[in-house]
């Protein structure tokens, strides 16, 4: 199950569309570009596809969905303020809803390792939504920048989508997984309470301890991990939307961000609000670094639990053999009957990945020069991956 989840979320593979060599001509400010005839993106996105043939890694679908939410909220906010024609807003909203639901994921084609502002992916969203909105509106003139991107810039949209994608994953995936694991550990603590065993410090025998007390310690680790991550929901729900290019809010109505944030807050059940510190929000990744640190601490807590279970189940004849872990698969191709602690081992490997992701986020956060940090895509991907990996690994650890 765990492996399947990772494949769905991260092995995005090639773009699957109708196989055809037909193209059409699209134009942007730099001139004409050939674009696949059945593609919903335009010239600027196609330039980015050609510029960045790096990894075949894309922004995760959760991020693309959040971009759709921001575009829909922006269209509705601009309509409320009398800035966007109601029919255009309605069509953009409908097209954005399809993006939210994942119908156009195969048309988000820009590599993750692109311009550090994420402009190419924001442009990709604007072009896909505009083309689909024109179809919905039966040919009404809807422009990617003038209408879909109204009152926005990549420099505030991408940081906002990055924050909210992480916050939503923490709320909907990580915290529930941790809460279930904590409940299981408390149950095991009660079950094992009467078992007295040798305590160990420095891996050497020490004074007696209840097995239930050891599991009580594990449950407390998870409880405190939840307490540490929850404050980051508020920090990540404070977004840069409304700052536009450099944080001054140029070309955006003064009430635009507030209106859009109210919409997003209701949809996501998060305390979404416009930041009071636009220059900080676009020029730094401070909230990302802090949240990643909390995620890292959760990972290390899980590593402690996983490694303890490996030690306590070691053997079965020449080890500690105080616990027996569920037998889930054969452990060796050469030693019949051998069974290994494969589930805890998978957890520890997830921890290794999370620690690497945290290091990458720390490095990317140092790319905040003057009015913009220019390494948003790699931080967005790594924090989201850390959160979802830990959620999946924790759930699997609990279930197995």
Regions found by a protein language model. Name each.
Residues 2, 13-400:
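Conserved, well-structured ligand/cofactor-binding cores
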């Amino acid at each position: 199950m765990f492996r399947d989840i990772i494949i769905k979320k991260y092995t995005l593979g090639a773009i699957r569309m109708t196989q055809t060599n037909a193209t059409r001509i699209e134009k942007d400010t730099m001139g004409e570009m050939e674009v696949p005839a059945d593609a919903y993106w335009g010239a600027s996105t196609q330039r980015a596809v050609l510029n960045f043939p790096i990894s075949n890694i894309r922004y995760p679908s959760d991020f693309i969905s959040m971009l759709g939410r921001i575009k829909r909220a922006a269209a509705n906010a601009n309509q409320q303020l009398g800035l966007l024609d109601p029919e255009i807003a309605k069509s953009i909203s409908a097209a954005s809803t399809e993006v939210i639901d994942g119908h156009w994921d195969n048309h988000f084609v820009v590599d993750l390792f692109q311009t550090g502002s994420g402009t190419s992916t924001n442009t990709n969203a604007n072009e896909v939504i505009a083309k689909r909105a024109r179809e919905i509106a039966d040919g009404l003139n809807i422009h990617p920048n003038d209408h879909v991107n109204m009152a926005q810039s990549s420099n505030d949209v991408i940081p906002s989508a990055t924050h909210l994608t992480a916050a939503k994953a923490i709320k909907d995936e990580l915290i529930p997984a941790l809460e279930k694991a904590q409940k299981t550990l408390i149950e095991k603590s009660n079950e094992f309470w009467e078992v007295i065993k040798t305590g160990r410090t420095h891996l050497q025998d020490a004074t007696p301890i209840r097995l239930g007390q050891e599991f009580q310690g594990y449950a407390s680790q998870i409880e405190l991990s939840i307490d540490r991550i929850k404050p980051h929901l508020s920090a990540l729900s404070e977004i840069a939307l409304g700052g536009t290019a450099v944080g001054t809010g140029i070309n955006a109505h003064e009430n635009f961000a507030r209106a859009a944030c109210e919409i997003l807050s209701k949809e996501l059940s998060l305390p979404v609000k416009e930041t009071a510190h636009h220059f900080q929000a676009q020029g730094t990744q401070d909230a990302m670094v802090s949240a990643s640190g909390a995620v890292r601490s959760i990972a290390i807590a899980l590593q402690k639990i996983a490694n303890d279970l490996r030690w306590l189940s070691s053997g079965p004849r020449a080890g500690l053999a105080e616990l027996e872990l569920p037998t889930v698969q054969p452990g060796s191709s050469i030693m019949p009957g051998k069974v290994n602690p494969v589930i805890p081992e998978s957890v520890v490997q997830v921890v290794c990945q999370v620690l690497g992701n945290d290091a990458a986020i720390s490095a990317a956060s140092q790319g905040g020069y003057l009015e913009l940090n220019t390494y948003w895509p790699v931080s967005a991907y790594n924090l989201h991956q850390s959160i979802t990996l830990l959620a999946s690994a924790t759930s699997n650890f609990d279930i197995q």
